[in-house]
From Swiss-Prot:
Belongs to the RNA polymerase subunit omega family. This is DNA-directed RNA polymerase subunit omega. GO terms for biological process: DNA-templated transcription. It catalyses: RNA(n) + a ribonucleoside 5'-triphosphate = RNA(n+1) + diphosphate. It comes from Variovorax paradoxus (strain S110).
Amino acid sequence: MARITVEDCLLQIPNRFQLVLAATYRARMLSQGHAPKIESKNKPAVTALREIAEGKIGLEMLKKVPG
């Protein structure tokens, strides 16, 4: 299992506060049943960080706040 680090994610979203918000929103979406954009058997939070690190998810998550 490859480990995900904050440094990998910061290359995609340089502001760590925005990174946390984007990962939180995406993890919430995943836990509500949205399909992941990558192949993953991890928990929603880890999957969200992996999606960010791979560039599949970015700051657009801050404009799509789940309701």
